Design a protein with these regions (language model features):
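Sec-dependent bacterial lipoprotein signal peptides
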Residues: 1-21
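Secreted/periplasmic proteins
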Residues: 23-199
Length: 199
């Protein structure tokens, strides 16, 4: 009887470990150790392409998918210092000084256009993480992205998020990030759908 109980405990413990491990992979970078410090250079890219299976967070199910026509309005927030240098959901390192973001369902990595509807400022970000899982927020931005959209101090803003295309795994942003400030975006929008230019 004692041997049976011991084996039962081992089996249950093993199953619990597997379950927790699979669940933790869906949470954001806070679950991973910090590899790079606040002032360290963080390498770009190096992750893997990921869409993912349906997953549950706090009792709510999310269904990752490729959605080339994604165009949504909602609340954006940002995450910074504490998460800097930790692995993101697709195996890249979060860099608060880069233009990146987290989204609950879109493929990783991808390029998104984010427009702050409170001041009409727009940028392109590299999507490489999952989240946010708070209220009606639809995107979590890096600290740098929040600065460029002038929402850092406020913490949140009403934004429009539009999918552009899949991003390269090597982290080479090319023309997307070389001149991300207002004015350069016209070149990008000509190569995308008319929905992206209808602001």
């Amino acid at each position: 009887m004692r041997n049976f109980t011991y084996k039962y405990i081992i089996i249950i413990s093993f199953a619990l470990i597997i379950t927790l491990s699979s669940c933790s992979s869906w949470f954001k970078v806070e679950n991973n150790p910090q590899v790079y410090g606040k002032y360290d250079h963080v390498p770009q890219g190096g992750g893997h392409y990921k869409v993912g299976e349906p997953y549950e967070i706090n009792g709510k199910w999310y269904y990752p998918e490729v959605d080339n026509d994604y165009d949504q309005v909602g609340i954006a927030s940002w995450y910074g210092d504490y998460f800097h240098g930790r692995l993101t959901a697709n195996g890249e390192y979060y860099d608060m000084n880069a233009l990146s973001a987290a989204h609950k369902t879109l493929p990783l990595p991808s390029y998104l256009k984010v427009t702050n509807l409170e001041n009409n400022k727009s940028i392109v970000v590299r999507l490489n993480d999952r989240g946010p899982y708070i209220d009606d927020r639809i995107i979590d931005l890096s600290k740098k992205a929040a600065i460029e959209l002038e929402m850092l101090n406020k913490g949140t803003a009403k934004v429009r998020v539009q999918y552009i295309e899949e991003a390269p795994l090597d982290g080479n942003q090319g023309n997307y990030f070389n001149n991300y400030k207002p004015g350069f975006l016209r070149k990008i929008w000509r190569a995308t759908s008319s929905a992206l230019t209808d602001l």
